[in-house]
């Protein structure tokens, strides 16, 4: 890989994308155990012979889960942390933090508590902390997995900026469409081997069946369409009347009116920090500070009762994986689990080979599938998925979509917080749009509503805006 080159690594979950990034930043062999054959050279030096602090000055890493790379509790300290460890004078350090926030246009995220940021905002701070150190090589492991469409466009501009600065960029990613204009080469991995190296032009020539057979997501969102027909709305079973949600006395959403019927799959969209996760937590009874009425089958249902009838798959699934094996996780905390259902769900989601593995040893996409499997087995009537396709390849995304359709057929009420246009077109019947504390749009997922859906997901002319 030469200077100023942008190389995209793609392939199914667990194919070795993250392992390659760990080889380049020295985490293999200096942190992760295993057998290493062959050599990895950075600037002509073997990586295993370079001290970690010197590697960190040359190679900047943005991990798949930004939470794993934070060392501070506020955003300014986090951005400054790397350069602080280079012992820069306080004045230069302050200037670099200022320059970083200006270059990346994240002034609004300054002086914020990291624990109060949305997943997408955390991702921006993780990138900023690396950018501040001005490394020559950038490694990004699925940097878009927590971002809304507007933030993905901002990420694309950031990548364009560092490319202009003469940096080398290595990206492991499932979402491919936003990188087609930036990547110089696309490396396709399968089961730990390089199976193909393409130019963007060659990659565009792949037919849709070929691409799907390789387990790859769409390269052009303009070629993704919702179903033509719209099923009639079912009788409402869940109703929200005049619901207002607050966080630390600040109103997040106000006067929300909504109804949902059995079998409905409802997408929830909005920019990072619009209140989508707060809304989903309130549905499940996990958020206390709210006014208004929640009704189930026309009867008021209090917060504690909602806790009992609902299940939520969180954006960061590491928070809800507790057991020592994948199989045990699928029945963790469930009275009298149906073992036949457990086996069938593991098989459907491609998790049977990993049933004895500890969940924490799985890739990000595999962990996501485990959490989705639990939602299938738990038997609750109201299911909420917060970004269920973050970190998922095409195969896993279609498996999760199929599972959600099955849950819908079982009469579950399903809400999906997502930024994934491809997934929404495959699974959702409606999309709710949150913006500035309100819910201005409730849009059916049909061909008739395609222009509005593309507007909500910022899809334009085959690229995102």
What are the residue ranges of the model-derived segments?
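The feature captures the beta-strand-to-loop junction immediately N-terminal to the Walker
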Residues: 10-12, 269-271
């Amino acid at each position: 890989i030469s200077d100023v080159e942008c190389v995209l690594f793609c392939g199914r979950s667990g194919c070795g994308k993250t392992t390659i990034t760990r080889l380049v930043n020295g985490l293999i062999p200096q942190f992760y155990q295993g057998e290493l054959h062959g050599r990895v050279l950075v600037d002509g030096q073997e990586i295993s012979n370079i001290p970690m602090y010197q590697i960190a000055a040359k190679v900047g890493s943005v991990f798949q889960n930004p939470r794993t790379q934070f060392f501070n509790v506020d955003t300014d300290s986090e951005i400054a942390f790397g350069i602080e460890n280079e012992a820069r004078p306080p004045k230069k350090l302050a200037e670099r933090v200022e320059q970083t926030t200006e270059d990346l246009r994240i002034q609004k995220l300054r002086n914020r508590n990291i624990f109060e940021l949305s997943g997408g905002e955390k991702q921006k701070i993780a990138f900023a902390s690396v950018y501040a150190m001005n490394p020559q090589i950038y490694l990004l492991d699925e940097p878009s997995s927590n971002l809304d469409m507007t933030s993905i466009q901002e990420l694309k501009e950031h990548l364009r900026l560092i490319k202009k600065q003469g940096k080398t960029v290595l990206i492991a990613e499932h979402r491919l469409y936003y990188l087609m204009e930036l990547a110089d080469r696309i490396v396709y991995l399968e089961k730990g081997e390089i199976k193909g190296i393409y130019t963007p032009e060659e990659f565009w020539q792949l037919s849709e069946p070929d691409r799907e057979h390789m387990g790859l997501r769409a390269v052009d969102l303009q070629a993704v369409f919702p179903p033509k027909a719209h099923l009639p709305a079912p009788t409402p079973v869940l109703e929200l009347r005049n619901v207002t949600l607050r966080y630390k006395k600040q109103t997040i959403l106000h006067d929300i009116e909504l109804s949902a019927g059995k079998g409905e799959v409802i997408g929830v969209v909005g920019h990072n920090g619009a209140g989508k996760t707060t809304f989903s937590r309130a549905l499940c009874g996990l958020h206390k500070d709210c006014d208004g009425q929640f009704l189930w089958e026309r009867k008021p249902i209090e917060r504690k009762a909602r806790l009992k009838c609902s299940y939520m798959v969180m954006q960061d699934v590491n928070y809800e994986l507790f057991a020592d094996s994948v199989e045990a996780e699928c029945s963790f905390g469930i009275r009298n689990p149906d073992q036949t259902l457990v086996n069938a769900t593991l098989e459907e989601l491609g998790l049977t080979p990993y049933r004895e593995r500890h969940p924490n040893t799985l890739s990000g996409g595999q962990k996501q599938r485990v959490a989705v499997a639990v939602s299938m087995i738990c038997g609750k009537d109201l299911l909420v998925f917060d970004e269920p396709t973050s970190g998922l390849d095409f195969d896993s995304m279609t498996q999760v979509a199929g599972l959600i359709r099955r849950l819908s057929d079982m009469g579950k009420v399903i809400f999906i917080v997502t930024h994934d246009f491809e997934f929404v077109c495959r699974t959702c019947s409606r999309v709710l749009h949150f913006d500035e504390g309100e819910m201005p749009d409730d849009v059916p997922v049909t061909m008739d509503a395609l222009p509005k859906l593309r507007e909500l997901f910022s899809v334009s002319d085959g690229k995102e805006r």
